[in-house]
């Protein structure tokens, strides 16, 4: 059994293994039954070759979900800022770093870049209410995600970005499905 990769949580990664979710509700969310769950905070990422339900809450932050349908490997990140301005910074709080780290982790679990599918979520204007909708921090994060994925040749097959509301994201590594609720 391969061990899921969870960055930034220390021993919490071990405590998350083996958790079983509750019965699915009537709101259309993916069923977490018999699947371990993980929550990804800002500046973290998660990748697994095992079935996992991964959740996060997004405002102006962005999550890129990647999935290799043939290998059954998937994961997501949660980044705060588009890119590091200083050389040598490798924090997953920055989109350019977080996406590269996620690509590396998925490759390490058997995923291949040529087969990856991407989904992009977040980028709301929850703080930038008085800026132009195209120039908010959230939309800068979205633009960076699209650019890095495009440069890597990874198609974005779904997205829910922008707007003025945050989002709760639920992603399943087993089949690449995602569920989003505006909050």
Where do the model's predicted regions map?
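Active-site microenvironment for binding and transforming phosphate-containing groups
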Residues: 1-183
